[in-house]
Each structure stands twice: as structure tokens, then as C-alpha cells.
Amino acid sequence: MANRGPVPSPLTPRQLECLSRIASGETSAEIGEALGLSKRTVDHYVLNACARLGVRNRTQAVAKAIGDGMILAPPP
């Protein structure tokens, strides 16, 4: 079978942005403020990302997104 390049992310750009910011240590409220969204909207993006990734919580979602190369790990 021919290599067709990288597999597209199952997540939306906004979900990826939220997970990236969570990985950097931001809370849902901080992410919402920075992006002009409510905390509840951010939580909704994260919940949907968890469902798409097949994980149970935001920590697992961040770990899977980093492990699968969807987002970059934050600097130490």
C-alpha cells in the first residue's frame, strides 16, 4: 500500500488550540478569556476532543494529542 502522508487530526483547530493551552498549564477560564470564549464553551471543546480521541479526561487527551503528534509538548 502506498504511503499517503500523515493522517489528518480527528480534532478541530479550536480543539487542538484548547488542548495545547491546557498542556501549557492554562485553565479553562484562562483559555476562554484569551480566546474570547466562556469557560463552559472551552469545557465543551475539551469534552468533544476527549470523545473523539477515546479518552476519559483532559489529561489523557493532552497526553494522546502530544503522543500522536497533534500538538507540541510545552517546554520544560
Regions found by a protein language model. Give the residues of each.
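Short amphipathic alpha-helical segments
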Residues: M1-G5, A73-P76
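Basic, Lys/Arg-enriched C-terminal extension of HTH/homeodomain DNA-binding domains
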Residues: R52-P76
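Residue-level detector of secondary-structure transition/capping positions
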Residues: E26, K39, C50, G69-M70
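Residues within the DNA-recognition helix of helix-turn-helix
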Residues: R14, Y45-N48
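Helix-turn-helix DNA-binding segment
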Residues: A2-T41
